[in-house]
């Protein structure tokens, strides 16, 4: 049955689907979605800084406008989530609106990356590597190799020659390390962009709802709603036409 999980040229879709399983924090969702948005722009190589800036920008509205919890609290009651801390640090040092566009927020983060350097460095220790754990199950979650990023990068390179990993990591200093998307996976990501991003969003919402149980309509609190999507003019026109064609017989059950 395992062969059913291969898309093209030994792309293991089962391993891909396993990337977002059993999260202890929300970072996997934001990391993968940030990568997807870069791929959608035609990029297949990008620095850790670029991906992290996208992650922080994607968390911005939920944290600033609705104060959603992105992860568990620390013992003292403060947030232990690095994305929450990064959003709050940037907002304390830079003038950015709660509903600012994603592209502008990303540029602000890049220009002021020093003030969230510690958060991004902490993210860089595990997130880029652990996302690939479903592709390298032979390592096991407690394998000491996970804490040795240099050797881990070399290991990924070796494994990628035997079976296609989603990406490999090009070594460098700190946040200049690069994510390099496998060309075969790149085609898969582009072909299935809408489906994959919808799947990531579903997983993200489930995780966040568990940490914000009293928040209704959480799906609408992750990003600003575009005005054009809120306009009901076309809907009204449609129902005006339906009423004209059918005449009487429609009853308003809401206002009467």
Task: Give the location of each predicted region.
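Mixed-charge, low-complexity interaction segments
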Residues: 1-255
């Amino acid at each position: 049955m395992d062969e059913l999980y291969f898309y093209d040229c030994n792309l293991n879709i089962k391993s891909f689907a396993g990337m977002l399983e059993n999260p202890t924090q929300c970072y996997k969702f934001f990391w993968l979605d940030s990568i997807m948005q870069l791929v959608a722009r035609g990029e297949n190589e990008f620095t850790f800084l670029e991906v992290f800036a996208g992650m922080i920008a994607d968390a911005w509205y939920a944290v600033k406008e609705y104060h959603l919890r992105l992860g568990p609290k620390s013992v003292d009651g403060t947030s232990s989530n690095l994305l929450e801390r990064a959003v709050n640090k940037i907002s304390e040092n830079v003038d950015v609106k709660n509903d600012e566009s994603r592209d502008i927020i990303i540029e602000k983060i890049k220009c002021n990356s020093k003030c969230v350097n510690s958060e991004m460095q902490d993210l860089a220790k595990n997130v880029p590597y652990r996302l690939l754990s479903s592709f390298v199950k032979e390592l096991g979650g407690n394998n000491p190799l996970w804490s040795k990023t240099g050797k881990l990068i070399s290991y990924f390179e070796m494994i990628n020659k035997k079976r296609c990993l989603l990406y490999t990591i090009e070594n460098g200093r700190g946040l200049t390390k690069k994510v390099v998307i496998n060309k075969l996976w790149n085609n898969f990501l582009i072909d299935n962009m809408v489906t994959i991003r919808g799947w990531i969003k579903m997983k993200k919402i489930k995780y966040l709802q568990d940490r914000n149980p009293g928040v209704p309509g959480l799906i609408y609190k992750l990003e600003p709603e575009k005005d054009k999507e809120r306009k009901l003019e076309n809907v009204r026109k449609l129902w005006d036409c339906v009423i004209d064609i059918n005449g009487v017989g429609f009853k308003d059950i809401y206002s009467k």
